[in-house]
Amino acid sequence: MILFSIPVKDGFFSFNVDNGSVLFAGSRYGRLDPKVAKGLVDRFGRLGFSFLTGCANGVDESFRLALSESDYTDSTTVACAFEERTYKLKGIFSLFVVPSGLSPKVALAKRTLWMTCRCSLLVLFPSDPIGKGSALAFKSAIYNNKPVFVVTETKPEETDLFSVYKSNLFGIVDGYWCIPPVYKETGLCYEAG
């Protein structure tokens, strides 16, 4: 279990995450500074996390590159919505995770749902305003009681499904933790499932 603590007005809000897999996702049109992607991979890797990311351009591609050049290649899965992409990705484990014959839109959505069901937490780099794919990843993670760190300047609107805490992730990126209510009650994510 990994403890995350977020400074709040009267102390800290802390929650534990099973150190399973961290999912990196975000905009197909965004690119990350390689130092950001490598820094996050290194920090989560040292905590014992394995990694999930997608096969798309943009944020996925930034993390695939960082992961392929890291010490954590053996603990990485790239989830692909299109079988031909699994053959193009070299040096990193890629897996075709949706049924054949789906429309591209449906295949991408199913791939996103596959990843969010298998991660312990989501680190999301959406466009502003948030795109459909990032919105689906966010909602799916929250509905599956997974904490989400959203790298954005725009504070997500708090709902009954999650609380929002402004924070910084490892001194690398600023954003907001979106925490499902189960964490507030127990502090433990694995009790949610």
Task: Specify the residue positions occupied by each region the protein language model found.
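Acidic/glycine-enriched connector segments
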Residues: I2-N19, R28-G175, P181, G187-Y190
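Residue-level detector of conserved, well-ordered beta-strand and adjacent loop positions
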Residues: A25
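Cysteine-nucleophile amide-bond enzymes
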Residues: G193
